[in-house]
Regions:
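C-terminal lobe and pocket-closing loops
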Residues: 292-302, 316-321, 328-435
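Alpha-to-beta junction loops
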Residues: 75, 93-104, 117-119, 201-202, ...
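Conserved N-terminal structural module of periplasmic/extracytoplasmic solute-binding proteins
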Residues: 2-115, 125-130, 174, 336, ...
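Hinge/lid segment of periplasmic solute-binding proteins
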Residues: 105-159, 165-168, 186-191, 199, ...
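Short helix-initiation/N-cap motifs at beta->coil->alpha
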Residues: 80-89, 107, 183-187, 265-280
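Glycine-centered hinge/linker elements that transmit conformational signals in sensory
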Residues: 187-194, 234-267, 307, 311
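Short, solvent-exposed loop/beta-turn-alpha elements that line the ligand-binding surface or hinge
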Residues: 92, 119-134, 177-181, 204, ...
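Extracytoplasmic/periplasmic solute-binding protein
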Residues: 33-34, 144-153, 158, 168, ...
């Protein structure tokens, strides 16, 4: 999910996606760009997500463009201001109007690859050294039908975020600033009770709207043994979350509200409200990705108040969700354009600690310090831990850390040598699934008499009929 926002989807988008997929099978892969060269014979690389207003982002990318064209005189960059959202992507892809280079999220890889909208980058990944240096857990997130169709941009795994001040008041911190780690979801409830009793604040906060609720719920449900979909022998997809395991996970969420009274009074919590509640000290814990401190400082949360640790276990599995963003290349691109795109990508996402990488990384960390953000979390990297880029970034984080490192040490150790299963997001219609699950969560948090199994039975049927059947 990250910071790249997606507009809420309706059933029509699922139908449009299905139609676009059908069109792609007939012709998307066969035709390459006709105007891939300019008058000077340079390869034209159209770059999407170009900032459309003055500011740091525009200045940075314009400087990168100038350097790139100087270092790669056979390529010319053309600006494209479109940014990814599912409501326009499939129409643009079917119409052949995607920029050569674009960005998206892990959740789109399977569908983009299946539709033939993303170029096969397998050989390019080998040529530029990415294949030997990519984190194995991330590789499967950029692979569709045994083809690598994207280069990872960033990655993160879920952890248990906590408010240091509330943990201290609740007696849940060691003397050196290390939090006590709940081993499972039952202990999370006990910790939340202590926070509510000792501080008067909500022990836990969960998002419930704009797909954020479903996003978090999937990772919880997996640990209860739930499965959300499976591919049949005929290639079709079947929804599979009308099960006792999924119902048990939803019951755990429901009990936070009705049995234990540990959640905020407002049950309609979108992404911004989620971060606002946590960032203003109104809740003690949540499930969040490792980059969450960037979101909560705008609400006044100070670096010394921010903590994160390992994801707790469930009754059936100990698993965490892997999320992230990707670089992709249109399947309409010629071989020269694919090569140019890979060179462009290397200036943005690299496993090598080049001079430019070192400069950009240090400047970024110093800017975070100026902005009052936490420096200390070593997020899950798309690259192997022994790559020079990861090592250099970690050295800088240790050098510039602006809070007690023990507040995040358990998460950093968890990321460095993750002892549990790291699972990518669901492969098909993932954003639609999140919306469906949002509705389930809202139903059980607003209706004390809601039957979790019945709620999921209907949701499973709706998801199958409205989305999976349209693939």
């Amino acid at each position: 999910m990250f910071e790249m926002k997606k507009k809420r989807l309706v059933k029509a988008v699922g139908l449009m996606t299905a139609a676009a997929l059908s069109v792609s099978i007939l012709g998307a892969c066969g035709q390459k760009a006709a105007n891939d060269k300019d008058e000077q014979g340079r390869t034209i690389l159209t770059v999407g997500l170009w900032p459309d207003r003055e500011g740091t982002a525009l200045t940075t990318i314009e400087e990168r463009k100038t350097r790139f064209e100087k270092d790669n005189p056979d390529v010319v960059i053309e600006r494209d201001y479109w940014s990814f959202d599912r409501q326009t992507f499939y129409a643009k892809a079917a119409g052949g109007t995607l920029p050569t280079y674009f960005r998206a999220q892990f959740t789109e890889v399977e569908e983009m690859g299946r539709a033939g909208y993303a170029a096969d980058l397998s050989e390019s990944m080998k040529k530029y050294g990415y294949l030997d240096n990519i984190n194995p857990a991330v590789l499967k997130c950029v692979t569709s039908d045994d083809k690598i169709v994207a280069v990872p941009s960033k990655a993160a795994i879920m952890g248990l975020s906590y408010n240091v001040d509330l943990f201290e008041k609740a007696g849940l911190m060691e003397s050196d600033g290390t939090p006590k780690q709940p081993k499972d979801w039952n202990e999370v409830v006990e910790f939340a009770k202590q926070i509510k009793e000792k501080t008067g604040q909500s022990g836990f906060v969960l998002p419930t709207a704009n797909r954020s609720g479903g996003w978090i719920f999937t990772s919880i449900a997996w640990s209860f043994g739930a499965k959300f979909m499976e591919q049949q022998a005929d290639g079709k997809w079947k929804a599979t979350f009308n099960t006792p395991e999924a119902a048990e996970a939803l019951q755990w969420v429901k009990d936070l509200k009705w049995k234990y009274d540990l959640l905020p009074a407002n049950t309609l919590v979108d992404g911004e409200e989620w971060y606002r509640v946590f960032g203003t000290g109104k809740a003690g814990m949540s499930i969040m990705a490792g980059d969450y401190p960037n979101r909560v400082v705008s609400y006044g949360m100070q670096p010394e108040q921010i903590g994160i640790m390992a994801t707790p276990a469930g009754p059936k599995a100990h698993v965490t969700l892997l999320t992230g963003e990707i670089h992709a290349v249109s399947s309409k691109a010629t071989d020269d354009q694919i090569d140019a795109a890979m060179r462009w990508i290397k200036t943005i996402s690299t496993y090598e600690a080049t001079d430019e990488f070192k400069k950009n990384t240090e400047e970024s960390i110093k800017q975070d310090l100026e902005d009052g953000k936490l420096v200390g979390i070593k997020v899950f990297s798309p690259w192997k831990n022994d790559t020079s880029a990861v090592k250099y970034e970690h050295e800088l984080i240790d050098k510039y850390a602006n809070a007690n490192p023990n507040h995040v040490r358990l998460y950093n150790e968890f990321v460095a040598n993750c002892p549990i299963e790291i699972r990518p997001e669901e492969p098909m219609c993932c954003q639609e699934l999140y919306s469906v699950l949002d509705n389930c969560i809202q139903e059980v948090l607003t209706n004390e008499n809601a039957d979790c199994a019945a709620v999921l039975e209907k949701a499973n049927s709706d998801f199958q009929q409205n989305y999976l059947n349209n693939l």
